[in-house]
Amino acid sequence: MTQFDFKKLVDAEYLLNNRTNNNIVVIDARGGMLEEGSLMYDKAIVVDWTDISLLGEFGGEELGKLLSKKNYQQIFSKLGITDESEVLVYGFTMPEQGFGDEARVLYTFSYAGFDNVKFIDGGFKQVEKLEFNKKYVPTTDRIDVSDIVRSEATQNEKAIYTDELLSKIGNTDVQIIDTRLEAEYNGRVIYGENKAGHVPGSISLPFNSLVDSNGFLKSRAVLEKYVTDKGLDKNKLQITYCTTGVRASYVAVILEELGFKVLNYEPSFARYANVGEVVLD
């Protein structure tokens, strides 16, 4: 049951009630983590975060950045998104699986000027219960962006990059939020970063701690108390990071809804570990 009153969040019943609505575009954001033959919603298009982001070397400055608005218009055309469309996105059901990819889509499309995007609370486990499923065939069910010549976003007002981040470490008007797992914050390398640890002074706020055991976003009151107890201050700028900016996008979307000013460090810790000081508390 949806507990968080957020206009960008709907339950699976909303998807069911709009099943015959031709203006609805459904995105399965599980992307490359979805194995061939796995169940998916029968009207969905599979999109990976790498399909809608700049590519580059792991640990470089480019990987994880958003694309140009021209690129997103090309992607919208492939997805069948028009000005009349409403996009519904689901991902894996956290906390067991997933990285909050559904909110990464929302974050990305918002930059591109398309705001009529909602993500489905509880993830695919709730969608699956609707019983309108099919088996995933990558060659036909995943978006093909191979013909798009990618270029970098400009004037991305909700992102921050490495040089600016480095200049803000230690700034008392800024709080840096590590959205990775607590184990990663404490020094475990899971996804191949060059160093273990975290950005000096950063606060650990794991992305999947925002959902309950069934994968539903916790209530506004519970989340407000949680982030306050973590020390987050609405009078300060929040900067979120993870490994390549996906989990950080999820937390950024929720924090913004809670009233925080947030920037997402898109190259994230994969890049930072190559150029910045890393600490273990």
Q: What is the role of each PLM region?
A:
Residues 1-12, 17, 124-200, 277-281:
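Active-site neighborhoods of enzymes that stabilize oxyanions during catalysis
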Residues 12-34:
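Hydrophobic alpha-helical membrane-insertion signals
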Residues 22-24, 83-86, 172-174, 200, ...:
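Loop/turn elements at helix/coil->beta-strand transitions in domains of secreted/extracellular proteins
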Residues 54-86, 207-238, 276:
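Helix-loop module immediately N-terminal to the HCX5R catalytic loop
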Residues 63-163, 247, 251-270:
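Thiolate-centered catalytic microenvironments shared by cysteine-dependent enzyme domains
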Residues 225, 235-242, 246, 252, ...:
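C-terminal soluble interaction/assembly domains
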